[in-house]
Curated annotation (Swiss-Prot):
Protein name, as recorded: NADPH-dependent 7-cyano-7-deazaguanine reductase
Superkingdom in the source lineage: Bacteria
Subcellular location: Cytoplasm
Enzyme's top EC category: oxidoreductase
Name of the coding gene: queF
EC number: 1.7.1.13
Residues at the catalytic site: C191 (thioimide intermediate), D198 (proton donor)
Subunit structure: Homodimer.
Natural source organism: Psychrobacter arcticus (strain DSM 17307 / VKM B-2377 / 273-4)
Pfam families: QueF, QueF_N
Family indicated by similarity: Belongs to the GTP cyclohydrolase I family. QueF type 2 subfamily.
Amino acid sequence: MSIHGILGEQTTDYPTEYSPETLYPIARSMGRDVIGWQNDKLEVGVDWWQAFELSWLNQQGISQVAIARFGIPANSPFIVESKSLKLYLNSINFTEFGSWAEVQKLIAEDLSKCVQAEVQVELFHLADRHSGLLIAQPDGICIDDALVNSTEKVALMLHPDASLLERDSSDAQISDGKTFSFYSNLLRSNCPVTNQPDWAALAVSITSKKVVNQANMLRYILSFRQHNGFHEQCVEQIFADLSQYYEPSKLMVRAWYTRRGGIDINPCRVSDIALLPVPSRLIRQ
């Protein structure tokens, strides 16, 4: 079945019994082959999924609710299609469990089987004051006003354009390299299944001998606005483009996508696993 098949249809049957078969895997190679870069360098990182509508029954038949976070390693052969995950989570709404640990174990097993890699699952009580659930702020400076003094209108593009990174840039370099940390709230792309817009905040920490031109970086981010790509593929495209242009010694790219169907997706790619940040949640989530 194509990813544009049943999952993309407007009318969907929502299962009321536990249905792990609803989970729909999508090969990461679909997006990585389009990028056409070194796939192994895109395999360092995690996709954090946060689910806010998780519910099941205890043995008294009383509904239980929790917030869940799933960590899918970037080296998994597959991702899970987001609507299929929503259907799967809905399917356990009326399933009885003896403990929270049973729920956690079942979800971890099913997701791991779907993506063919070990998925980390955390469940949080609504009363938890867990720091990872509090509203955070991206590190670095916001570049969303970098073009405020520009007299040139930013054009809409059908595809991301990495050549914008070098537009009007000088060849000046920093001999020892410098770390630039910045973010933008303006990343937008389209879901390739439904064509609905996906909005995200994007954060980058990059150590490079090349100076980061904020105006060019913002133009580049805006070039994604009409691009059809899954969340993970968009972040990997950005990681690949920045790697090739800036030749950084260190690079971290992460995005916090806004929630849809009670689920938000937060991919992160790093040049070294030691650079992996902790999962967090932003104000639009």
